């Protein structure tokens, strides 16, 4: 009798994210203390944010505006029950001076939203948002002798961050992979940066992720035991934590171990999660309404006014760039990642430059300069007007792509008018056909062996001839005119010499063998699209190897 092995169980991850968005207000949520990052410890504090007896909190109106804008952008319903209130979340920790946190519990500011994400190679997916609520941040502990509490000799507390305004955005458990988790977090970051409600600087803690993950057999409806992962301060950390924790929990199930509901810490050094404490439940925090703050009530007219302030969000821009401007999904994604870059690109297009050409220039030459100098696009001297003028000079045939490439370093350093710089240096492109024909004739006359080889089948030598002409004109020749002239002249058959007297004894010699040509480097006029990232590069002066006398007559 034969036995059949049980089929191998396939597991899937069930993931939800809690994202803490630090709102870019000048002052804290309930007091007038500064929120500036990096100040001397314990200087941005007052009796209110340090929980001194007799003080009363006052809600920051700007923080409320930012929270409602964010909720509107995430398609949330603003306090569907008609009002929203604050609650005290009770817990004891050294960086929480009041021994409670002012947060929101049963009546959050907004609920039931969604965010659409795009993962390469997969259809767009909608991730549900359970709730968005406001709360104050805690202080910060600095552990001496180690980078965390374990192993430290003592801890110092900095209350500068205590009381800073936060929005906590809780997703539905709709995420299934590490790539989806990173896409969700990335899109959320883009939205809050577009709105101007958060700078999104993860290295400063402006955007922090808590990951909730469980595993279950694929297709099963019941959830597994949830584990929370903290200390995720980058998209890479988020992805690696998902991958590690998924594998760890699957290993536990396969080995018969029980998964414990707990909070774990992501350790960047060891690339694994470490158990911190058992996971708290809501009743552990003993929530009750905050007696010192009145409920928030917004009417429909006010909520509509917030929605009208949203403007075009990243997903809407990407769709417009693809459908209206004809850009690829990749180009649309790169250009809309930051609002300033998208606005720069749109200004270049508005000045008459074709969208594809502008996209290639911004995502190519401009982006390379930004990466090299670590500047934002608003800080560079090549303004949209300068970019449009430079690209227009190329399109008008006044300069070549090669000349444009040579001008860029000076323009990035000093700014100014590209047209004036061209005139000052005498770099106007030579497009006169008669003038270029004379130069082409000189080049071909000096390369008779290579001409013979070209006519014998080595047509890839065309790039070599183009390079020679470009060298003679210091890169100023119009590559298209040069290509046309060369192809025309090389196609002409040379004038046959007068016939020699016949000799019965002579036998015609076999034609010389011509070895295969090396691969030809692309030339500017053949392959470069006007204004493309590839086009704004110098053409090779001699793209193919010239033919020596021995090569031609071997």
From Swiss-Prot:
PROSITE patterns on file: GATB (PS01234)
Alphabetical keyword list: ATP-binding, Ligase, Nucleotide-binding, Protein biosynthesis
Record's compositionally biased regions (Low complexity): 502-540
Superkingdom per UniProt: Bacteria
EC number: 6.3.5.-
Protein's UniProt keywords contain RNA-binding: no
Protein name stated in the entry: Aspartyl/glutamyl-tRNA(Asn/Gln) amidotransferase subunit B
Gene giving rise to this polypeptide: gatB
